[in-house]
């Protein structure tokens, strides 16, 4: 990966065809250049030296990658996988601390951010495999032997899936508020049944991608993000006083919905995974230590850590709660989060 930034092609397979992609630029005030500028505004505030550029994988695809290092080569690198709808820029509050004593890599998942946005399969298992293989090809391209793999949300699910398939490459698996672990509860067993109107709305929205509303909103999409998620501006207020982060999130999610469509094909109504990870994680190599980090104030079910422990009774599994943090643990309480992650990484070396 070159030290200087290299421009990525903006003509991936799914961008060359289809009425939607031809219509989007005229309706949504976005482009790959807008996304690049939004990312650059974020990275300018990162307090450490980094290299960025595309890593080429198969089928002409590229994985947009950031490497941070203080010329430390004898430590196992930490690799960060962002969640659904995110990008590598959202780790801005963490880069400075995490790279002090080991190399840190962050990249935009295939189909997200500034990485290529190809057409994914429609089968959930094959989609998962496409993501996993893109991570493995990325690792091979960079010549990394073993890594500490950390994933948030969707990134946590994919980190676990990768660890299942390529256990010899993972020194420690860190799951941060992971998506897709429990199976959907039986509606009849829920203490608070889902109201009929919500079920009807869910059925009506099933044909659409999760973030289609942003693209439909067109020129009003950015203000929609700012109104619906003002918390992101607060989370990053120590680094940015303006709408830098919400602009970045907007431009990440109004491009061609490649990864978004892939995610939709991995889900069943109300956002549950078609292939829950708890059904498989017991088969993971018992030598891989697993740490599960949750926000104590998160609305996401935090019982997956306990479930993983019961499914891997003879393996290292530790659950860590970050006080005062919600689902976006790394942004809600970055200092505590960074400290816990560094402590985990130190046990590996």
From Swiss-Prot:
It comes from Sus scrofa (Pig). InterPro entries: AB_hydrolase_1, AB_hydrolase_fold. This is 1-acylglycerol-3-phosphate O-acyltransferase ABHD5. Its EC number is 2.3.1.51. It catalyses: a 1-acyl-sn-glycero-3-phosphate + an acyl-CoA = a 1,2-diacyl-sn-glycero-3-phosphate + CoA; 1-(9Z-octadecenoyl)-sn-glycero-3-phosphate + (9Z)-octadecenoyl-CoA = 1,2-di-(9Z-octadecenoyl)-sn-glycero-3-phosphate + CoA; 1-(9Z-octadecenoyl)-sn-glycero-3-phosphate + hexadecanoyl-CoA = 1-(9Z)-octadecenoyl-2-hexadecanoyl-sn-glycero-3-phosphate + CoA; 1-(9Z-octadecenoyl)-sn-glycero-3-phosphate + octadecanoyl-CoA = 1-(9Z-octadecenoyl)-2-octadecanoyl-sn-glycero-3-phosphate + CoA. GO terms for biological process: cell differentiation; fatty acid metabolic process; lipid homeostasis; negative regulation of triglyceride storage; phosphatidic acid biosynthetic process; positive regulation of triglyceride catabolic process. Coenzyme A-dependent lysophosphatidic acid acyltransferase that catalyzes the transfer of an acyl group on a lysophosphatidic acid. Functions preferentially with 1-oleoyl-lysophosphatidic acid followed by 1-palmitoyl-lysophosphatidic acid, 1-stearoyl-lysophosphatidic acid and 1-arachidonoyl-lysophosphatidic acid as lipid acceptor. Functions preferentially with arachidonoyl-CoA followed by oleoyl-CoA as acyl group donors. Functions in phosphatidic acid biosynthesis. May regulate the cellular storage of triacylglycerol through activation of the phospholipase PNPLA2. Pfam families: Abhydrolase_1 (PF00561). It comes from the Eukaryota. One of its GO terms (molecular function) is carboxylic ester hydrolase activity. A motif (HXXXXD motif) lies at residues 327-332. Transmembrane segments: none annotated. Belongs to the peptidase S33 family. ABHD4/ABHD5 subfamily. Interacts with ADRP, PLIN and PNPLA2. Interacts with PLIN5; promotes interaction with PNPLA2.
């Amino acid at each position: 990966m070159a030290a200087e930034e290299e421009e990525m092609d903006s003509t991936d397979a799914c961008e060359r065809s289809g009425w939607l992609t031809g219509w989007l630029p005229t309706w949504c005030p976005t482009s790959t250049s807008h996304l690049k500028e939004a990312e650059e505004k974020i990275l300018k505030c990162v307090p450490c030296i980094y290299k960025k550029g595309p890593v080429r994988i198969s089928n002409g695809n590229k994985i947009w990658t950031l490497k941070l290092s203080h010329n430390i080569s004898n430590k196992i690198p930490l690799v960060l996988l962002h969640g659904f709808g995110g990008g590598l820029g959202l780790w801005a509050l963490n880069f400075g601390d995490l790279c002090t004593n080991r190399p840190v890599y962050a990249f935009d998942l295939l189909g997200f951010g500034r990485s290529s946005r190809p057409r994914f399969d429609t089968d959930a298992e094959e989609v998962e495999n496409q993501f996993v293989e893109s991570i493995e090809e990325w690792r091979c391209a960079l010549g990394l032997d073993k890594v500490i793999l950390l994933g948030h949300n969707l990134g946590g699910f994919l980190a676990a899936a990768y660890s299942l398939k390529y256990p010899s490459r993972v020194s420690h698996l860190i799951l941060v508020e992971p998506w897709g672990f429990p199976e959907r509860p039986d509606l009849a067993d829920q203490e608070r049944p889902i109201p009929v109107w919500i079920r009807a709305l869910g059925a009506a929205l099933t044909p659409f991608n999760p973030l289609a509303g942003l693209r439909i909103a067109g020129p009003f999409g950015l203000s929609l993000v700012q109104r619906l998620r003002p918390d992101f501006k607060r989370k990053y207020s120590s680094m940015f006083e303006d709408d830098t982060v919400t602009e970045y999130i907007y431009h990440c999610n109004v491009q061609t919905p490649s990864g978004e469509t892939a995610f939709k094909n991995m889900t069943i109504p109300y956002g549950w995974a078609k292939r829950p990870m708890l059904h498989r994680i017991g088969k993971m190599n018992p030598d891989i230590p697993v740490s599960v980090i949750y926000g104590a104030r998160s609305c996401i079910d935090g019982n997956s850590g306990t479930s993983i422990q019961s499914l891997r009774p003879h393996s290292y599994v530790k659950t860590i709660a970050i006080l005062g943090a919600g689902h976006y643990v790394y942004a809600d309480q970055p200092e505590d989060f960074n400290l816990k992650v560094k402590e985990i990484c130190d046990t590996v070396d």
